[in-house]
């Protein structure tokens, strides 16, 4: 008879422990599943802030058309943007080494770059143009022979000028330095993306002009590491949703007003 109290205590303890174990396991499983379902994927995005109005730094904040666009895409696809800045020529190497997942910097889609990184569908139509002082006798690309032309290092303008004989090319990490070289007389022309050249004119620099029209037809794409094809799909899906809803055009108008030259129409 004395054994019964002991057995009863053992049975009660066993039931209590079993109940705690089952309850704890179910709660942990439910909690983990809920967190995973609602968790945002963090994407590391790199930008070159010397490319207004696409990327620029204002009062310590990175802003611009590309920045607004990638944030809008991220919101559509439940992604969280972790922004960092770097020089343009460092963007593709950073993608290749998985230092970053995405790069936005008005990056022209080219076959050479597409071998190294993936590109989203185009989001802006651009081209190169020549910027000179208003009193310059340069009228087009053929007049650049024998002249000094300032370019941004690693850009399509740099590539184009490096293939053109008889041109003295000055390369700069920052396009503002190239513009300063033109203003100071160290270069007779700047070859760069037309929307940025136009933005330079429209922000108080009335002594310069664009000549010769667009030299190339180029499309900008969002660059994505080749290691994450599923991320590329999300970015393309988000971009398509923005275009379908009209939000893409709203962002475009915010920066480019009534100028339709760069607008991608679907």
Language model region names:
Residues 21, 67-76, 153-155, 221-259:
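Extended ligand-binding regions for polar small-molecule ligands
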Residues 15-19:
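C-terminal motif of bacterial Sec signal peptides marking the signal peptidase cleavage site
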